[in-house]
C-alpha cells in the first residue's frame, strides 16, 4: 500500500490523476495540497491556501510516491517571475517535501522540448526544473514530456484552442495527447517496482503506453 502526495490536482492532468488515485486499491492515503479547496473528495487530505507552499507545508505524514502536475503558461502566470515560481520553485518544493517525508519515487509532468539550454523561455524553465529534480538523486524519477494536452480545462488557453486541431494531425512527439492518457501512464509507472533511476517519457512514448 502506498501513501501519495500530489500537487496540481486542480489542473487538467492532475484532476484525472487524483480521481484515478482515489479508485486505486494500492493507494491508502492521498495528500493533495491546493490553492483552493477540492470539495468533497473522500479519503483525500486537502490542505489549501492561496499560497501553495503554505498548503504543502501542512503535509507531514510519511509519503511513498510524489506526483507533481503543476504547470501554467507565462500568459496565465502574468510575468516571467510568476511563471518560474509556478513551474520551477513549487515543483522543486513539492519534490523536497516528498523526499523529507520518505518518498522514493517522484513523477512529474514537464513538457515536450524541455531543455535547460533552450533559447525559448518556457522550454528552458522546464529543462531547469528537470535538472533540479535529477540533482536531488531520487531512487526513481519519472519525467513525462507530453505535447499539447487535450481535455476540458476550467479555463481554456487561447493558443491551445487555436492549435489543437493542427496538433491532432502532426506525427510523432508533436501529436497532441489526451490528458487522461498522461495521468493513466503516470499512475501505471508509479506502480512498476522494477525500474530505478531516471525515466523520461516522450509524448509518443506516453501515447504508446496508454494504448
Curated annotation (Swiss-Prot):
Coiled coil location: none
Gene3D superfamilies in alphabetical order: NAD(P)-binding Rossmann-like Domain (3.40.50.720)
Family: To yeast YER004W.
Gene, per the UniProt record: yraR
Domain of life the protein comes from: Bacteria
MF terms (GO), sorted A to Z: NAD binding; oxidoreductase activity, acting on the aldehyde or oxo group of donors, NAD or NADP as acceptor
Pfam families recorded: NAD_binding_10
Protein name: Putative NAD(P)-binding protein YraR
Entries under InterPro entries matching the protein: NAD(P)-bd_dom (IPR016040), NAD(P)-bd_dom_sf (IPR036291), Semialdehyde_DH_NAD-bd (IPR000534)
Amino acid at each position: 500500500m502506498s501513501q501519495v502526495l500530489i500537487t496540481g490536482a486542480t489542473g487538467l492532468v492532475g484532476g484525472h490523476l487524483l480521481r484515478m488515485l482515489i479508485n486505486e486499491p494500492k493507494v491508502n492515503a492521498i495528500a493533495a495540497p491546493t490553492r483552493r479547496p477540492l470539495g468533497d473528495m473522500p479519503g483525500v487530505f486537502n490542505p489549501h491556501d492561496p499560497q501553495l507552499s503554505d498548503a504543502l507545508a501542512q503535509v507531514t505524514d510519511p509519503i511513498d510516491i510524489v506526483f507533481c502536475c503543476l504547470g501554467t503558461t507565462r500568459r496565465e502566470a502574468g510575468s516571467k517571475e510568476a511563471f518560474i515560481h509556478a513551474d520551477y520553485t513549487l515543483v522543486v518544493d513539492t519534490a523536497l517535501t516528498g523526499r523529507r517525508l520518505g518518498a522514493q519515487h517522484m513523477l512529474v509532468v514537464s513538457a515536450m522540448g524541455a531543455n535547460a539550454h533552450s533559447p525559448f523561455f518556457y522550454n528552458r524553465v522546464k529543462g531547469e526544473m528537470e535538472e533540479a529534480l535529477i540533482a536531488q538523486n531520487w531512487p526513481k524519477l519519472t519525467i513525462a514530456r507530453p505535447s499539447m494536452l487535450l481535455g476540458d480545462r476550467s479555463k481554456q488557453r487561447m493558443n491551445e484552442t487555436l492549435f489543437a486541431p493542427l496538433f491532432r494531425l502532426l506525427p510523432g512527439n508533436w501529436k497532441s495527447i489526451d490528458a487522461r492518457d498522461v495521468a493513466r501512464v503516470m499512475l501505471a509507472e508509479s506502480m512498476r517496482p522494477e525500474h530505478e533511476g531516471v525515466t523520461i517519457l516522450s509524448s509518443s512514448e506516453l501515447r504508446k503506453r496508454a494504448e
